[in-house]
Amino acid sequence: MSRRCDLTGKGVLSGHTVSHSNHKTKRRFLPNLCNVTLESETLKRTIRLRVSANALKSVDHRGGLDAFLKKARDEELSPRALDFKRLIAKAAAEAASTAA
């Protein structure tokens, strides 16, 4: 399992730890990933994803998983999240056609 956020694509960065004497040693900056279960209102089911804490805040800010995926660019989403985005768009289109 890679250390990459399913929603934002945030991954591992590398850099230096700098001591008081300015001695630099290599280190890795790991993203704050959480295994979460988010609910899709359009699909009426839950979805398990591995997302960063920052992405979780963004999902809340945008008004839920469906709104986040609708607005997100395809390049930053994982293949699994992209599948859910397509399923949600398809279900929303079907719901709109049956309502009309």
Curated annotation (Swiss-Prot):
The lineage of its organism: Bacteria, Pseudomonadati, Pseudomonadota, Alphaproteobacteria, Hyphomicrobiales. This is Large ribosomal subunit protein bL28. HAMAP family: Ribosomal_bL28. Residues 1-24 are annotated as: Disordered. GO terms for molecular function: structural constituent of ribosome. SUPFAM superfamilies: L28p-like (SSF143800). It comes from the Bacteria. Belongs to the bacterial ribosomal protein bL28 family. InterPro entries: Ribosomal_bL28, Ribosomal_bL28/bL31-like_sf, Ribosomal_bL28_bact-type, Ribosomal_bL28_sf. GO terms for cellular component: cytosolic large ribosomal subunit. The keyword Ribosomal protein applies. It comes from Xanthobacter autotrophicus (strain ATCC BAA-1158 / Py2). GO terms for biological process: translation. The keyword Ribonucleoprotein applies. NCBIfam families: L28 (TIGR00009). Keywords: Ribonucleoprotein, Ribosomal protein. Disulfide bonds: none annotated.
